[in-house]
Design a protein with these regions (language model features):
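Basic, nucleic-acid-interacting segments
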Residues: 1-175
Length: 175
């Protein structure tokens, strides 16, 4: 069982297209399109498991997509951006209760990309730590042709998410 911490509404701001070299283009065609973000929860006390592997991440998304299709709240077309997955990856030593620094991966638009991106990022973080380095709290993007994640920007504070509760909507708890 994977818990859901919150579901909130956002607006799409657009899409960055990374082209040759260090150039990027901005596509505003989706600007203003409403988004529903689902944030998962790991809470052993409440019986909610964590996602431990790329296989589990892909399976969770497959099941979540089925539920969203059944409820009629999404058409689930990942290739068109109707359903996206932006996993946060954090590893920890076996037996430790503390997770390490978290990275977020953007641009995962298929179940295969979710599997490959999560698998790569777990291996990358393991390699960084094994070589004596430090994992940086950052947003990374999935580069499908190269099958690697690439740094987009660092995240110093949780406030950088610019998440503001809507004062006219009361929080609701579902069981």
């Amino acid at each position: 069982r994977i818990g859901i911490r919150r579901v909130h509404l956002e607006e799409d701001t657009g899409k960055l297209l990374h082209v040759e070299g260090d150039r990027s283009l901005v596509d505003y065609n989706r600007s203003g399109v409403p988004l529903m973000e689902i944030v998962t929860e790991h809470d052993p006390a409440a019986g909610f498991d964590q996602i431990n592997s790329a296989d589990e991440a892909r399976e969770y998304l497959v099941r979540l997509r089925s539920i969203l299709l059944y409820l009629g709240v999404s058409d689930g077309k990942m290739e068109e951006g109707s359903l996206r997955c932006e996993p946060n990856i954090s590893i920890r030593p076996k037996g430790s209760g503390e997770f390490g620094v978290r990275t977020e991966i953007k641009n995962l638009n298929s179940f295969r990309a979710v599997y490959n991106g999560v698998k790569y990022e777990i291996e990358r973080q393991e390699r960084v730590l094994r070589e004596g380095g430090t994992v940086i709290h950052e947003t990374r993007r999935w580069d499908e042709p190269r099958s690697v994640t690439a740094s987009m920007r660092s995240k110093e504070l949780e406030q950088e998410y610019r998440y503001f509760p809507e004062p006219d909507l009361v929080p609701m708890v579902f069981e």
